[in-house]
Amino acid sequence: MPSSTSPDQGDDLENCILRFSDLDLKDMSLINPSSSLKAELDGSTKKKYSFAKKKAFALFVKTKEVPTKRSFECKEKLWKCCRQLFTDQTSIHRHVATQHADEIYHQTASILKQLAVTLSTSKSLSSADEKNPLKECLPHSHDVSAWLPDISCFNPDELISGQGSEEGEVLLYYCYHDLEDPQWICAWQTALCQHLHLTGKIRIAAEGINGTVGGSKLATRLYVEVMLSFPLFKDDLCKDDFKTSKGGAHCFPELRVGVFEEIVPMGISPKKISYKKPGIHLSPGEFHKEVEKFLSQANQEQSDTILLDCRNFYESKIGRFQGCLAPDIRKFSYFPSYVDKNLELFREKRVLMYCTGGIRCERGSAYLKAKGVCKEVFQLKGGIHKYLEEFPDGFYKGKLFVFDERYALSYNSDVVSECSYCGARWDQYKLCSTPQCRQLVLTCPACQGQGFTACCVTCQDKGSRKVSGPMQDSFKEECECTARRPRIPRELLQHVRQPVSPEPGPDADEDGPVLM
């Protein structure tokens, strides 16, 4: 599998070392060169042989790395292979070179194949019409095999989350890039995820791709490598654009890949509001300073700055920035109407926007900017996810809601929400116990023990009446408490800051989210 950056001509050891700076790749004498493989290559690809061999070796060694309790503090590395534990680079390198030459050979051949495709693609792109690059860089058929990594040298169990030696992982990413053939990308992504045993959800549109996938760490690493080497995305994506968290394939019930009009459902055509005119990106460090400055003001209500949470109410309910304005909306597709209804609130204001991973702010900030009422519009690059990686004990309090079966990620010990029934501090969502309901509910163990497991009194009553028949689990209906909920709230011109401690306990009929 190729590097995210195609190597220059000649010996590309430097690129390989930059990509795997923790490995000593200079001494390759232990690997027997495959003269037959090299002899079969054309001139341009043959020049990449040295790079491919070193890259194959580095990738193989990297997959054998195991975490240690002290690795975070002192960069200690251990490797496990063939039921042996290796404590230094020299010993693991010697073992791989002498015992796994065949695997290195096959992986080298695979990398060379991918490099040949990349070289051909680059030549096609340079001569193609700039408005239609996809027609030149991808096959006209839906044969996606050229962009699937070779996994023959890996233990099959290593690709399956929970069965390998490492804990699984969940990736969250997006990439805005005009796509000529979203259907081809959809077919490729489906094949790629199935190939790597990944589950999750991926939305593809003419404006780009938005995905969250889970699997083993080996599988997610290979997925990132392929994405970074893919011609259409490699200039717009970098490794830091992939947010990672503990998890795996079990975090999603299945793999869903589809083509839509938008990669994040705001409900407005990208032709009307484009991602190309967003608010100014602030790094987590820059955003932290802006929030610190905002919170240090004696009277935030009189400030010219608004800290705006672009997420849904059930997300901000269990975690949010101090002093934020958190709209009481159920879907992101309600956000444009929320802005329209509360436009005066944003007039002559500096707006600091944030969301989970940054994607909603891209077009949400573009929509707010297009209204022409704000002084400035900023957005948190990488979203809360990246902010918490740098500032786990910063100004964001509580948990980070995620759209998978984990429901939330914890970076600090703060609990900012409460049980819907008794008002005790609680922030762990569960599905409403009524089979036909779509809601999430906050109910503490004590209340659960008393049978309070539904999102509202109406659902609690429905749950006590058993429903029989084949449609019991598949039929869904909107909860009555959702139907009664105001769709678009109107804020006071001097909005009330969200506190960092739990709010007063809600009425028993307060609803939870519709899962999307």
UniProtKB/Swiss-Prot annotation:
The modification Phosphoserine is found at S269. This is Thiosulfate sulfurtransferase/rhodanese-like domain-containing protein 2. The keyword Methyltransferase does not apply. Keywords: Phosphoprotein. Residues 490-516 are annotated as: Disordered. Residues 506-516 have a biased composition (Acidic residues). It comes from the Eukaryota. Gene3D superfamilies: 3.30.70.100, Rhodanese-like domain. Residues 301-396 form the Rhodanese domain. SUPFAM superfamilies: Rhodanese/Cell cycle control phosphatase. The active site is at C355 (cysteine persulfide intermediate). InterPro entries: Rhodanese-like_dom, Rhodanese-like_dom_sf, Rhodanese_C, TrhO, TRHO_N. PROSITE patterns: RHODANESE_3.
